[in-house]
């Protein structure tokens, strides 16, 4: 079902964004099909990640202004409430959930960054607590999250061993920085 909603107004420390592109990832499929761990209250708008331009800023927002190009990860709150919404024309998010994007980056590229890089970053820094000099094995390294894991692993100073199928995928993973 598609509904028309009023323009969104940001509260303190929030920004309203005109969505120009939204990422689509497996978690969105789980939400839409009712398989996500904590289903959102209905009606809900799916979509975890977006890119666009800031329409308005709430009180207390620093470092961002109307017209800035940004990517956003829409917060998921683990208290049983969910706020997604990237599959809409506008979203409101905390300013802590956005990053500026360069003028030469397409919105479709920026919209695909938050979940894949966020997943890899959390896995490597919070869960695995990867340290410089350690060895990281990335299976499926030519996929989205695997590619991000290779790059983040190298940035963290790890020796990265990556697996991929086919010579073209292996070459791409090596271009991303995999050691083996």
Show where each model-derived region lies:
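Residue-level signal for nonpolar/aromatic packing positions in well-ordered secondary structure
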Residues: 52-54, 67, 101, 120, ...
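A local structural motif
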Residues: 1-4, 158
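Mid-domain Rossmann-like dinucleotide-binding core that forms the NAD(H)/NADP(H) cofactor-binding site
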Residues: 111-180
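Cytochrome P450 core scaffold surrounding the K-helix E-X-X-R motif
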Residues: 27-33
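NAD(P)H dinucleotide-binding glycine-rich loop of Rossmann-like/cofactor-binding domains
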Residues: 63, 73-140
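Short, conserved catalytic or interaction motifs in soluble domains
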Residues: 59, 103, 165
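Glycine-rich beta-strand-centered segment in the early N-terminal region that forms part
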Residues: 6-24, 35-76, 85
